[in-house]
Amino acid sequence: MDDAESRFTHLLQPIRDLTKNWEVDVAAQLGEYLEELDQICISFDGGKTTMNFAEAALLIQGSACIYSKKVEYLYSLVYQALDFISNKKRDQQPASVGADGVDKDATFAHRNDEEEFLSLDDIIDPKKTNVDIKKDQVLHVVNIVPLTPMALVPPEETEKKNNPLCSRKGEVLASRKDFRMNTCTPHPSGAFMLELAGKSPMQFLQHIQHHEEASLAQGEQNAIPEGENDNMEAEKSDCADPVQVLQFSDEGAPAAENGDGAGFLPLDDHDEAGDGEVEQAEHIERRKMQTEERGYVLRERLEQKPASAIKNETSDPWCGLDPFESCEEKPFKKGKHYTLPRGIAEDLSSNKRKRKLPCKLQDFMKWFSSTHWDGSEAMKSRRKGPTFADMEVLYWKHIKERMTAQRQLHRRMGAQFVKEVTLLNQEEELVNPLEEPRDADYLDYDGPADDASDHEDLGENIPACLREEPALGDIEPVTLHDQLSYEELVRRNVELFMANSQKYAQETVLSLRVREWEDKMGPQLQEQEERGAFDIHDYGDRLTAQFSKVGEWRSFASLMADKEPYEVCRYMLASLQLANDYTVEVSQKPGLHEGLDTMALRLLSQQKAHERFKTYTAPSISQQ
């Protein structure tokens, strides 16, 4: 054991000096220990032959530690060697500063020369040079100076202090302009516009409409590919005045939508058919000549097409629709709701078994005549037409129909019919003295009823009610009574409705029993309400007043002669109270049946018990 401890001392105690770690031969010690492990035979002989696992673990740990120290020492030696080599080369180089203090690395040849301005004579004039462009080469790329939108320019610190965003503790978290939704403008498409530039959501919708009209006028000749068309439309919707890019194409474009009457050529090349080929050839030759001379050219403006050409062309109803285009929103219109009257609604077929009530609708003329006509008021002065606002419309409607039918009959029957009608009217005036003459302008209307030509086709469509003159001849509008107020009218109608609706009430078995109970208990409850209040002291005084002297015996039956049953009960309670106060003595015969109705009372004192308590004093107080 001591031999093992001495052998592995350097493994248990790490060596701090890196150079001494190289003195330990880790490979040899591990090889020796491996040979010892090969010689050990593990057997189940009661623990005589054992293997020290702790010793093996310490050996491996110590070996790894020493090996790492060796690597670390070797690493440091390599860096020291590199530093030594570099320092040696630096020492061998001569110094750049001489004995006179002049640095040889720096040159001062032109130190004493005078300063001169930079000469600009060597710059070549661009006007004297021409740019050679091939005829078949078309420049599509235009260099545009990028301009940062104001919405992307970070705000200054002073602007952030105007509207700060503070927390609950008062700490400044951010500013209002730190959020894009506060500095940008929402677009109808859902995007945030960096610069508004006078553009509003309504102008965006108007722009789409103008674009559709221009595309219809342009037709197939100036068609634009779908990809570029969508991009151009998106760019135009984001800016109020889109920048017109340079154009080197060989084709015309539709008129601009800004209203100035001029436009630019499109960016695409397409062939045109018809009479425009000659004009296009002239434009192409002119642009090629300008391109060879100057090197660049702007898009030419086309003459504005007349507005009549756009209006005359109609949209093709069979063309395909854009599935991504928003449909036109139509305002919601609420329809009319009609409610059928009760009498008409019950005539409809229904599977529900309900009791059919009689129809409450009656003839309007009969109801109106019975409600608004009274013989006592016939002689009074009346205004033309009814005064009830709800009935006035119906009244004039019926009168208008009658007059229209009457004029139609006059036109068809001739002058003879007019004479007969006049005679009949005179006879009716004599027979009916209650009828008062009307004014000359009683039924003068400025509406369609006065126009005879409007009713020439009403020959057989005369209302049936107008053919029965006797049934409708006595109807005259009257005014309501002056003293009848609105409240009284409502009360009268409600009472009439309640009286008429009582017979339609459905009676059940439970309702019949309740009604019988009410008929039985109603009189009894009314009788109890009419009785006087029960005062026990008052009834006690009445009972003692019937005794002539103290000590007299009287039966309770004799005292209660000719009394009501409820009075007997009250006197019985009063007698029990008197017996409790020792004012009377109660006795009866022994036996259950023998003692029935044998109650007798004897007066013990005529002094009232409740009065004694008013003058009662305690013995302790009276002795003092």
Swiss-Prot record:
Entry keyword set: DNA condensation, Nucleus
Alphabetical GO biological process terms: chromosome condensation; embryonic body morphogenesis
InterPro entries (alphabetical): CNDH2_C (IPR031737), H2_M (IPR031719), H2_N (IPR009378), Ncaph2 (IPR031739)
One GO CC term, this protein: nucleus
Disulfide topology: none
Ranges annotated as biased composition (Acidic residues): 269-279
Pfam entry (one): CNDH2_M
Keyword Translocase part of the UniProt annotation: no
Location relative to the cell: Nucleus
Region (Disordered): 215-239, 252-287
Signal peptide limits: none
UniProt subunit comment: Component of the condensin-2 complex, which contains the smc2 and smc4 heterodimer, and three non SMC subunits, ncapg2, ncaph2 and ncapd3 that probably regulate the complex.
Function in brief: Regulatory subunit of the condensin-2 complex, a complex that seems to provide chromosomes with an additional level of organization and rigidity and in establishing mitotic chromosome architecture.
Family listed: Belongs to the CND2 H2 (condensin-2 subunit 2) family.
Name of the featured protein: Condensin-2 complex subunit H2
